[in-house]
Amino acid sequence: MPKVTDIANELKQAIDAKDEVQIAFIASEYSAESREKIAKAYVASYGKELPDDIKKALKGGSEESLLMDLFSDRHEVRAQHIRDALSGRNDHMAFFDTVILCTPEDWHETVAAYTRMFKKPLVEDFMKDVGRKEDWCLLMEKWMAHERVSRPGSPEDEAQRLDQAFDQKNTAYLIDFFGTVPSAEYRPIAEAFKAQNGKSIEQAIATIYTKTDYYTFYCAHFALLGMHRLAAYLINCACNDKGDEKRMRRITGMMVDKCLGAKHAYKIYGDMGTDIERCFDKRMAPILRTLWRVK
């Protein structure tokens, strides 16, 4: 990695030139942790916060917000997104992008940031707002605890128990299973489930759940297979007819460096670069393609 002061200088030149794609390119070269160091070096060199300079130089919109997020404290960014999603009518899609698409380490820091910023404990605030009447709410509560426990049986045994839970609509078991099974153990169970039943877990989810319940369990399924798999699915959802810039800002700004494999996982839906080009305008599309490293 070049000296952070040199990278900060490159960014200053790109910002002065109002070159959004170049700012995105520089961001795409580094992890979130490295970008935070670059942002600190920028302040040391120029006496200004990097996101503030981006905001002054660019012309608003989700593009500006995304580029600012990339050089901001990502835990504070996630905390703010969650708070926004809880304000007024709950934004369920935002919960998938921020709560489920998140590593345990990042979640721990997000909880601390939320308390610091809003003087409230995140999980309590979340559950008070959404309630506990629906299964998706209870799964979210389990998910936010990040308490994974090894399953007692073999993958085949666990797959059989899971199938019984689907058949009996034992939602308490399903909530506990998806909320606590370790990711490393999930794939073998999923493979055994399909071999035994001739259908996938995602197909089984669709037999008993609809709407927000369905999407929450579906996202949990992909997250357990790998965050890049979930990112690919969420990006595909965001690539609707008009393109959902708010969702792409959340997904990309917080997780792009951890989910670059999404461009390969996306192949089951089509070509990520092509879909981004089709759904987003000539300002946003090049930024997204650059950050996700797709043509």
From Swiss-Prot:
InterPro entries: Alpha_giardin, Annexin_repeat, Annexin_sf
Intervals holding Annexin repeats: 2-71, 73-143, 153-223, 226-293
Gene Ontology molecular functions: calcium ion binding; calcium-dependent phospholipid binding; phosphatidylserine binding
GO cellular component labels: cytoplasm; microtubule; plasma membrane
Compartmental location: Cytoplasm, Cytoskeleton
GO BP terms in the entry: cytoskeleton organization
Major subcellular location class: cytoplasm
Source organism, top-level taxon: Eukaryota
Pfam family for this entry, one: Annexin
Keyword terms of this UniProt record: Annexin, Cytoplasm, Cytoskeleton, Microtubule, Repeat
PANTHER family named among the record's database cross-references: ANNEXIN, ANNEXIN B11
Family statement: Belongs to the annexin family. Giardin subunit alpha subfamily.
Role this protein plays: Giardins are involved in parasite attachment to the intestinal mucosa and in the cytoskeletal disassembly and reassembly that marks the transition from infectious trophozoite to transmissible cyst. They may interact with other cytoskeletal proteins such as microtubules in the microribbons or crossbridges, to maintain the integrity of the ventral disk.
Name the UniProt record assigns to this protein: Giardin subunit alpha-1
